[in-house]
């Protein structure tokens, strides 16, 4: 029915953000996981909901954060989150090198200060840490991986990081080559509204969820907001106001003509055979 049954918030205040230098903003991914575990346990206890009553799991997360993990899915550094501006010069240089035409037609955005540019900063400034990296993920991908034990991502997630080539429907070889990113860092790409993975034994023990519970959805907070407000098909326009004010408009046309005015990402229901931006 879409009716909320129960809610839990952990912690009661915002998760702390670390800023070692002016313009930096980081959070440790393990804190997200810790609070997810605590919130899930609290929700199950206070609501009297049995774990076996939960049919599937969806995750909404802060967009654009960079998470690098080793083969055991342990973070190799704190996440460089959305409001960290250190990567801006890398994005500006990539835009100049790749050209406005490529960025408009393939990326639908300037690389800017998005996730790919944040990774370029790590490659340039922390090469030893980069060399130890097994997979790159967005914040929601990390939480799903901790639940399931399987690193995965989505096209909508890759697009918010400006990793995705929409014209060829694959990761952008030109961008990866420019930033010298190893494409093997990209996890398995899965669709939303499908069984992406299931909660592992470890994930169940940590959260109180039932082992085998399907994970079927993940999306950044803004596209998730758009979807929950009813933006599902081309022509839908919705808006939200809060910490930021955002207007969302959906289209099925591949166009980056508004490159300097708006951000264009794959919507949560994007599929190569049924595009939605």
Outline where the language-model segments fall:
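N-terminal glycine/serine-rich phosphate-binding loop of ATP-dependent small-molecule kinases
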Residues: 1-77, 93, 132, 187-188, ...
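Gly/Ser/Thr-rich active-site cleft segment
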Residues: 102-220
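Short glycine/proline- and acidic residue-enriched helix-loop micro-motifs
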Residues: 21-26, 100-109, 272
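Short, hydrophobic/amphipathic alpha-helical packing segments
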Residues: 33-41, 116-119, 220-223
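A generic secondary-structure signal
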Residues: 39-46, 121, 125, 229
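Glycine-rich phosphate-binding loop of actin/hexokinase-like ATP-binding domains
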Residues: 66-71, 75-93, 133, 137-172, ...
């Amino acid at each position: 029915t879409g009716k909320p049954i129960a809610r839990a918030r952990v912690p009661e205040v915002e998760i702390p953000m670390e800023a070692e230098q002016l313009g930096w903003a980081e959070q440790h991914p393990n804190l997200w996981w810790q609070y997810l575990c605590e919130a899930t346990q609290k929700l199950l206890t206070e609501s009297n909901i049995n774990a076996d009553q939960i049919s599937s799991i969806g995750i909404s997360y802060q967009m654009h954060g960079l998470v690098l993990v080793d083969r055991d899915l342990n973070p190799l550094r704190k996440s460089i989150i959305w409001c960290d501006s250190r990567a801006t010069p890398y994005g500006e240089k990539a835009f100049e090198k790749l050209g406005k035409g490529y960025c408009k037609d393939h990326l639908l955005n300037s690389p800017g200060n998005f996730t790919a540019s944040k990774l370029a900063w790590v490659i340039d400034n922390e090469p030893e840490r980069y060399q130890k990296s097994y997979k790159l993920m967005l914040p929601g991908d990390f939480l799903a991986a901790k639940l399931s034990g399987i690193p995965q991502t989505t096209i909508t997630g890759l697009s918010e990081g400006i990793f995705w080539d929409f014209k060829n429907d694959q990761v952008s070889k030109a961008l990866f080559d420019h930033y010298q990113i190893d494409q093997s860092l990209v996890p398995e790409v899965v669709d939303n509204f499908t069984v992406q993975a299931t909660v592992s034994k470890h994930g169940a023990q940590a959260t109180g969820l039932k082992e085998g519970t399907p994970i079927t959805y993940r999306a950044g907070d803004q596209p998730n907001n758009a979807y929950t407000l009813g933006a599902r098909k081309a022509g839908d326009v919705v808006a939200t106001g809060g910490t930021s004010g955002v207007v969302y408009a959906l289209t099925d046309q591949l166009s980056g003509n508004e490159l300097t005015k708006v951000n264009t990402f794959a919507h949560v229901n994007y599929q190569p055979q049924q595009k939605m931006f």
